[in-house]
């Protein structure tokens, strides 16, 4: 396998920058996920690696070798698309072997590679079938197998699960993760689905409007987002955002607005003071699971507020409750056994250690 290096890579169309200063090292044997909304530049970035798009500025290195001007066939990469692009008149075996036959590889080696890949993907029993006799998941496995037999330096996957139904996507996410472990492959995986990114990636690159917003492990992306965009894009349901002011009283800090007053813990307060945010406007980000329902037996804290239940989403293991607290509309994740009805008035508390504060102007997170 191989490492990749993007050195300030840019892509422009008619003077319009679609990928802006993409600077990143992809480690050998890493599964790196590029995630972001449609049009953020993630697929364009992948196509530049494949050689299907030219690089406007910067350098792309595979194992230390500059490949900007190398044609796709000389880059030793394999690509899997959301459309399987299988030849309908060929068997599964012939579809998987097609690229090797074009290279004039020996028949014995072709057979060995195809059967080895089929064993890994558990499709040996399908080798004599044609694509029309396969399910969507089986076709996707064949498309993966066609890439595996080439034994490339790098696998590129461009939204390969988009055409599958929800249940099959979950299964195939696991299959691709297992495949990565077995092959010890370097994989760059593109998706707009943040759940795929969180569950599959060794690291995640969050992109928006052609720019890298954050590169980190899934845990850090979720708990320590770099900015407001990352915080809002990653997580389902999304993070709650509250606009307010950092108020100082008797040496302590509170986040306040017309609807809510939250006491800021000592360590967070100290850092906010040091960075000059006392008395300033900020945005507080609260994950739905970091808002809890208070009961009559709970001790009252400063970060407690009253809310009215608007809608419940019962997902079985959990309950997503949409509430109004004054002028603030919030999403709350509670245990599935919680008994709450629309119209109820409930008391909620915020786990302040988990709140992320953002600069109101730059929208950058403040830690």
Swiss-Prot record:
<dbReference type="GO" id="GO:0140359">
    <property type="term" value="F:ABC-type transporter activity"/>
</dbReference>
<dbReference type="Pfam" id="PF17912">
    <property type="entry name" value="OB_MalK"/>
</dbReference>
<dbReference type="InterPro" id="IPR012340">
    <property type="entry name" value="NA-bd_OB-fold"/>
</dbReference>
<protein>
    <recommendedName>
        <fullName>Uncharacterized ABC transporter ATP-binding protein YurJ</fullName>
        <ecNumber>7.-.-.-</ecNumber>
    </recommendedName>
</protein>
<dbReference type="Pfam" id="PF00005">
    <property type="entry name" value="ABC_tran"/>
</dbReference>
<dbReference type="InterPro" id="IPR015855">
    <property type="entry name" value="ABC_transpr_MalK-like"/>
</dbReference>
<keyword id="KW-1278">Translocase</keyword>
<dbReference type="InterPro" id="IPR003593">
    <property type="entry name" value="AAA+_ATPase"/>
</dbReference>
<dbReference type="InterPro" id="IPR005116">
    <property type="entry name" value="Transp-assoc_OB_typ1"/>
</dbReference>
<dbReference type="InterPro" id="IPR008995">
    <property type="entry name" value="Mo/tungstate-bd_C_term_dom"/>
</dbReference>
<feature type="binding site">
    <location>
        <begin position="36"/>
        <end position="43"/>
    </location>
    <ligand>
        <name>ATP</name>
    </ligand>
</feature>
<dbReference type="GO" id="GO:0016887">
    <property type="term" value="F:ATP hydrolysis activity"/>
</dbReference>
<dbReference type="InterPro" id="IPR003439">
    <property type="entry name" value="ABC_transporter-like_ATP-bd"/>
</dbReference>
<comment type="similarity">
    <text>Belongs to the ABC transporter superfamily.</text>
</comment>
<dbReference type="Pfam" id="PF03459">
    <property type="entry name" value="TOBE"/>
</dbReference>
<dbReference type="GO" id="GO:0008643">
    <property type="term" value="P:carbohydrate transport"/>
</dbReference>
<keyword id="KW-0067">ATP-binding</keyword>
<dbReference type="InterPro" id="IPR027417">
    <property type="entry name" value="P-loop_NTPase"/>
</dbReference>
<dbReference type="InterPro" id="IPR040582">
    <property type="entry name" value="OB_MalK-like"/>
</dbReference>
<dbReference type="GO" id="GO:0055052">
    <property type="term" value="C:ATP-binding cassette (ABC) transporter complex, substrate-binding subunit-containing"/>
</dbReference>
<dbReference type="GO" id="GO:0005524">
    <property type="term" value="F:ATP binding"/>
</dbReference>
<dbReference type="InterPro" id="IPR047641">
    <property type="entry name" value="ABC_transpr_MalK/UgpC-like"/>
</dbReference>
<dbReference type="InterPro" id="IPR017871">
    <property type="entry name" value="ABC_transporter-like_CS"/>
</dbReference>
<feature type="domain" description="ABC transporter">
    <location>
        <begin position="4"/>
        <end position="234"/>
    </location>
</feature>
<keyword id="KW-0813">Transport</keyword>
<keyword id="KW-0547">Nucleotide-binding</keyword>
């Amino acid at each position: 396998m191989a490492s990749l290096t993007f050195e300030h890579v840019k892509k422009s169309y008619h003077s319009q920058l679609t990928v802006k200063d993409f600077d990143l090292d992809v480690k050998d044997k890493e599964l790196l996920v590029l995630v972001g909304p449609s049009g953020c530049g993630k697929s364009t970035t992948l196509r530049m690696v494949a050689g299907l798009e030219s690089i406007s500025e910067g350098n792309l290195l595979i194992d230390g070798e500059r490949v900007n001007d190398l044609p796709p066939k000389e880059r030793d990469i394999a690509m899997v698309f959301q459309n399987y692009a299988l030849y309908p008149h060929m068997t599964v075996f012939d579809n998987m072997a097609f690229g090797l036959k074009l290279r004039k590889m020996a028949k014995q080696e072709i057979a060995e590679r195809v059967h080895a890949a089929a064993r890994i993907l558990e499709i040996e029993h399908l080798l004599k079938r044609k694509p029309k006799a396969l399910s969507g998941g089986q076709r996707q496995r064949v498309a993966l197998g066609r890439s595996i037999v080439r034994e490339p330096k790098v696998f590129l996957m461009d939204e390969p699960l988009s055409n599958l139904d929800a249940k099959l996507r979950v299964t195939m996410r696991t299959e691709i993760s297992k495949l990565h472990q077995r092959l010890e492959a370097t994989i760059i995986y593109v998706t707009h689905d943040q759940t795929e990114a969180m569950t599959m990636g060794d690291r995640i690159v969050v992109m928006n409007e052609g720019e890298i917003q954050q590169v980190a492990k899934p845990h850090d992306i979720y708990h320590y987002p770099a900015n407001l965009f990352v915080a809002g894009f990653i997580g389902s349901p999304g993070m709650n955002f509250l606009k307010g002011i950092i108020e100082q009283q008797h040496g302590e800090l509170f986040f306040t607005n017309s609807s809510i007053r939250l006491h800021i813990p000592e360590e967070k307060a100290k850092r906010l003071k040091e960075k000059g945010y006392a008395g300033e406007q900020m945005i507080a980000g609260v994950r739905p699971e970091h808002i809890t329902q208070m009961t009559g037996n709970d001790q009252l804290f400063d970060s407690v507020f009253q809310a009215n239940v608007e809608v419940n989403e019962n997902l079985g293991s959990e309950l997503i409750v949409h509430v109004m607290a004054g002028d603030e509309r919030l999403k709350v994740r509670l245990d599935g056994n919680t008994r709450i009805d629309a119209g109820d008035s409930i008391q909620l508390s915020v786990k302040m250690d988990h709140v992320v504060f953002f600069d109101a102007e730059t929208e950058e997170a403040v830690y």
